[in-house]
Curated annotation (Swiss-Prot):
Cofactor: FAD; FMN; heme b
GO BP annotation list: fatty acid oxidation
Swiss-Prot/TrEMBL site (Important for catalytic activity) positions: 271
Residue segments, region Disordered: 462-482
Protein name: Bifunctional cytochrome P450/NADPH--P450 reductase 2
Chain positions covered by the region annotation NADPH--P450 reductase: 476-1053
Catalysed transformations (reactions): an organic molecule + reduced [NADPH--hemoprotein reductase] + O2 = an alcohol + oxidized [NADPH--hemoprotein reductase] + H2O + H(+); 2 oxidized [cytochrome P450] + NADPH = 2 reduced [cytochrome P450] + NADP(+) + H(+)
Domain Flavodoxin-like span(s) in chain numbering: 486-625
């Protein structure tokens, strides 16, 4: 430990201590400025209390250790207890009512619950949209005021089935007026000296009146619900009134219910309204981000009434909100106290009971965690949640005392921002400059804008989800056809995992299983060896759920082989917003079950609440049932009588397309999909691992063929051009040369366009002639004909710009080509090949790829070009299935048969892929006792801090004696560009020595420039060493190729 250091402190002013450093209306901002001056930790003495403030992410990581620190109620929150009592926000962790209420209310904020709130959220969001759409031109909008109305009405309706009807009032609801005044007074009381406070008689009387107004409304809500109970209403209030704590069996008393309602009405709207206000400000001051978010809203929110699933697909808008919370966390601090004497950072002593406050805005701008652009608004930094620095992002607080309503707030904010962007152009007509208003939370002060309606369809609202839930019929259980036992165990605090377990059991009964459910802890020491065991669980702040903790500890203590005979599968519930603990417990259970001898029925499934959870779950369930039925040799599946047969009539599995059948494709299940480039890079390279079926084999150096799908954006462009709907069903009939299409059977047009035809190929001459023949405008027809008649024009205007048939159809509306002709002219969607970057010697049924994601400005000058396959792969989630097949290249790109043969490997960028597999194989061979020949790897990338792929893994391989690595970089500032051929030239003598010893040379990557340059360098090396002519070096290299000692795996083009 370092020598103890005094904690920095600003200048002290006698009995006022450090108080003069605080500006009256800018308490939080004053503390931020002190942090700028004094650094990541400082002491601040108020009259009567001394506090420590931290903002450096390493120090925050320490104070967020719940074994050392717990939530502290500062003076401000203690004053809020006057009306918040021992509600969730203003209670101490040790108070019985916090623990009881926390357990009772958690299920209302599960992912499953969010879907139930969708129509109510949409109801209130629509009122905002309608209000703004009816404004006169140039009429000002007070953003924070309208967002306060919106978020109050939303929590009122979703939580308590109460309508504040704020949009139908000229002034704020009396509850809001009293609440805001009471919050401000509570904060003011916390800053006053004792004598000052005693003199504020009139202010204190108003404070009590405001508390009475809030209590009166809430007590009336409780009384009305008690007088008119409704079993069909499953909201927060019903849970508070009737639900029993699963631990104590007790319900909440009326006084605590009052405190909880007030807590949710305050916390459930103040922070979210501030978030939306700041988000609009950030977008208006960053037009390029506004455009990108608006494009996503247009692309995704295509229905008049947006569905829950569509809101989940607003990924960039969610990134905008996350980045807004990073720069402007609306709850800007949380306070803790030390449970025992401790030391921070190895040098700052903290005594027991010492308050420590985390300044979240400064934490979120810590350049040591976020990089040099920490002050910039860059939503893209949240594209890969796993890259978010651990303990450097805390907008919702920490651990078990983190905001219970996080998912609710983000779901609401995502919906509202998406709808606002879809329907309005936002105008910063005053050139507003940010001024932050402080109370318990922060928000933009006096932020006003104008809006202009966009040409979009009017929004309709139907509260259909609730009606659908009521109308659902209980599935009819079929009599068991085979009676195979199915035990579905769950670990659940929020209720999501338990609900999924119940649904899986119900599905199992319909399929003829004898199914039952139970908490994981109920089966400690008695997992059955007969039948299947399914485990559905979540992580809770990185720890097991309450009813799974004992099971996890029991698993850890088992010896290897003790679970032999148990057949199992795991599905995990999680949220990537908490990157550091995402899927920790499900993955731990899955790995330990396997390690202790159990047989895995299928790869783990992972549902991400920050993404399309239902899609992840459905994909895993389909795979689980298929592989479980196969494992137990069950052929008959009972019909699910509550599902219309029509819903499965038109399903088209990826491996059932004509192209897939032609290639013998099978389903690979995604086990991992992670970013390899750093957050500082603007590009993307993904490491993707697939589990392939038993019996499918591959070798190092093989290719994996992927049958991709066209993006939703591309497909939507086709639908829009031809006036089609995504749910239109068609039947294709035609001649034999169209055998790549699904003939003579119904198929949804969106499935056809997604999986069967190429939409991004440059238009062929034949296609252009056909387009011209269907064009009724003579000048436009002539333009199209000219593109075909002149080879130079065709190459320059079509091929060089990669203009597609769809591009021309959009450019020439007078072209009346029918959809069936368009479809007939499109080529079959071709497989894309990737070098396998793994070795079967490590995992026989796991294949990995290293995929460079193609996203760049289109050569046509029209927006962004996105590679079909790389973007399809990049967006796959764990548990998703991809149609794929294995191919061995004819070039002989395989490891030498003799491990002692030297190897020279050249693979810049993603060309490193096969060599990663080679190195894995060499590691296994070495462990088995083989003597390895020397191996050189030449790798190049742009910058060591951006795209040095697999750096740590390769460094370890080099330390283990498996390979010698030579690296070069082409984009390092103030340094000459370095490419692999330059390294080869430097190593001429070494290379020739190895080649004379029989070395095999492998080149993988770009075939247009890199590979020819490498070949030229090898020939020059031979000429220099042997004093040979160009002709002789050419013969020498050709001979190496003929002997399969010089092999290439290269590609050209975009």
């Amino acid at each position: 430990m370092k020598q103890a250091s005094a904690i920095p402190q600003p200048k002290t002013y006698g009995p006022l201590k450090n108080l003069p450093h605080l500006e009256k209306e800018q308490l939080s901002q004053s503390l931020w400025r002190i942090a700028d001056e004094l650094g990541p930790i400082f002491r601040f003495d108020f009259p009567g209390v001394s506090s420590v403030f931290v903002s450096g992410h390493n120090l925050v990581a320490e104070v967020c250790d719940e074994k050392r620190f717990d939530k502290n109620l500062g003076k401000g929150l203690q004053k809020v207890r006057e009306f918040g009592g021992d509600g969730l926000f203003t209670s101490w962790t040790h108070e019985p009512n916090w623990q009881k209420a926390h357990r009772i209310l958690l299920p209302s904020f599960s992912q499953k619950a969010m879907k139930g709130y969708h129509s109510m959220m949409l109801d209130i969001a629509t009122q905002l949209i309608q209000k703004w759409s009816r404004l006169n031109p140039n009429e000002e909008i007070d953003v924070a005021d309208d967002m306060t109305r919106l978020t109050l009405d939303t929590i009122g309706l979703c939580g308590f089935n109460y309508r504040f009807n704020s949009f139908y009032r000229d002034s704020q609801h009396p509850f809001i007026t009293s609440m805001l005044r009471a919050l401000k007074e509570a904060m003011n009381q916390s800053k006053r000296l004792g004598l000052q406070d005693k003199m504020m008689v009139k202010t204190k009387l108003q404070f009590q009146k405001d508390i009475e107004v809030m209590n009166s409304l809430v007590d009336r809500m409780i009384a009305e619900r008690k007088a008119n109970p409704d079993e069909n209403i499953k909201d927060l209030l019903s849970l508070m009134l009737y639900a029993k704590d699963p631990v104590t069996g007790e319900t909440l008393d009326d006084e605590n219910i009052r405190y909880q309602i007030i807590t949710f009405l305050i916390a459930g709207h103040e922070t979210t309204s501030g978030l939306l206000s700041f988000a609009i400000y950030c977008l208006l001051t960053h037009p390029e981000k506004l455009k990108k978010a608006q494009e996503e809203a247009d692309r995704v929110l295509t229905d008049d009434t947006p569905e829950y699933k569509q809101i989940q697909q607003l990924k960039y808008i969610r990134m905008v909100l996350n980045e807004t919370l990073r720069l402007y966390p609306t709850a800007p601090a949380f306070s803790l106290y030390a449970k025992e004497d401790t030391v921070l950072g190895g040098e700052y002593p903290i005594s027991k009971g010492q308050p420590v406050t985390v300044l979240i805005p400064k934490l979120h701008r810590d350049q040591n965690a976020w990089g040099p652009d920490a002050e910039d608004f860059r939503p893209e930094r949240f594209e890969d949640p796993s890259s978010i620095p651990h303990h450097a992002y805390k907008p919702f607080g920490n651990g078990q005392r983190a905001c219970i309503g996080m998912q609710f707030a983000l779901q609401e904010a995502t919906m509202v921002l998406g709808l606002v962007l879809k329907h309005f152009e936002l105008i910063n007509h005053t050139g507003y400059e940010l001024k932050i208003k402080e109370a318990l939370t922060i928000k933009p002060d006096d932020f006003k804008i104008t809006v202009k309606p966009r040409k979009t369809a009017a929004i309709n609202v139907q509260r259909k989800e609730q009606a659908d839930i009521k109308a659902e019929t209980k599935p009819k259980e079929t009599k068991p056809k085979h009676g195979t036992p199915l035990l579905v165990l769950f670990g659940s605090n929020l209720g999501t995992a338990e609900g999924i377990a119940g649904e899986l059991a119900a599905q199992g009964r319909q399929m003829g299983f004898t199914a039952e459910t139970a908490p994981l802890d109920d089966y400690i020491g008695k997992l059955p060896e007969e039948g299947a065991v399914v485990i559905v669980t979540a992580s809770y702040n990185g720890a097991p759920p309450d009813n799974a903790a004992g099971f996890v500890e029991w698993l850890k203590e088992l010896e290897e082989g003790q679970l032999k005979g148990v057949s199992y599968a795991v599905f995990g519930c999680g949220n990537r917003s908490w990157a550091s603990t995402y899927q920790r417990i499900p993955r731990l259970i899955d790995d330990m079950m396997k390690a202790k001898g159990a047989s895995r029925l299928t790869a783990i499934g992972e549902g991400d609440a920050a993404d399309d959870f239902e899609s992840h779950r459905e994909s895993w369930e389909n795979r689980f049932w298929k592989e479980t039925m196969d494992a137990f040799d069950i052929n008959e599946i009972a019909q699910k009588e509550d599902r219309p047969s029509l819903s499965i009539t038109f399903l088209s599995e990826a491996t059932e397309t004509p192209v897939a059948k032609a290639y013998g494709a099978f389903e690979g299940i995604v086990l991992e999909n992670r970013e390899l480039q750093t957050a500082a890079s603007t590009r993307s390279t993904r490491h993707i691992e697939l589990e392939i079926p038993a019996g499918k084999t591959y070798k190092e150096g093989d290719h994996i063929g992927i049958l991709p799908k066209n993006s939703r954006e591309l497909v939507q462009r086709v639908l829009s051009r031809f006036g089609l709907q995504s749910n239109h069903v068609i039947k294709v009939s035609g001649s034999a040369h169209m055998a790549h299409l699904p003939m003579d059977r119904p198929i949804k047009v969106v499935d056809l366009l997604s999986s069967y035809v190429e939409l991004q190929e440059p238009a062929s001459r034949l296609q252009l002639r056909e387009l011209a023949s269907y064009t009724v405008c003579p000048p436009h027809q002539k333009e199209l004909e000219q593109l075909v008649s002149d080879d130079g024009i065709y190459k320059e205007q079509v091929l060089a710009k990669r203009l597609t048939m769809l591009d021309f159809l959009e450019d020439y509306p007078a072209c009346e080509m029918p959809f069936e002709r368009f479809l007939a002219l499109l080529p079959s969607l071709k497989p894309r090949y990737y070098s396998i970057s793994s070795s079967p010697k490590v995992h026989a049924n796991i294949v990995s790829m290293t995929v460079g994601v193609v996203k760049a400005s289109a050569w046509s000058g029209r927006g962004e070009y996105r590679g079909v396959a790389s973007n399809y792969l990049a967006e796959l989630n764990t548990g998703d299935a991809a149609a794929c097949f294995i191919r061995t290249p004819q070039s002989g790109f395989q490891m030498p048969n003799d491990p002692e043969t030297p190897m020279i490997m050249v693979g810049p960028g993603t060309g490193i892929a096969p060599f990663r597999g080679f190195i894995q194989a060499r590691s296994v061979l070495k462990k088995e006792g083989s003597t390895l020949g020397e191996a050189l790897l030449y790798f190049g990338c742009r910058r060591p801090d951006h795209d040095d792929l697999y750096r740590e893994e390769l460094d370890q391989a080099e330390q283990d004696g498996l390979v010698t690595i030579r690296r070069c970089y082409s984009r390092v500032e103030n340094e000459p560009k370095g490419y692999v051929q330059h390294l080869l030239k430097q190593d001429t003598q070494k290379l020739m020595t190895l080649i004379e010893k029989g070395a095999h040379i492998y080149v993988c990557g770009d075939g247009s420039q890199m590979a020819p340059d490498v070949e030229r360098t090898l020939r020059l090396a031979y000429e220099a060493e042997k004093a040979a002519s160009q002709e002789e070096s050419a013969v020498w290299l050709q001979k190496l190729q003929d002997q399969r000692r010089y092999v290439k795996d290269v590609w050209t083009g975009m």
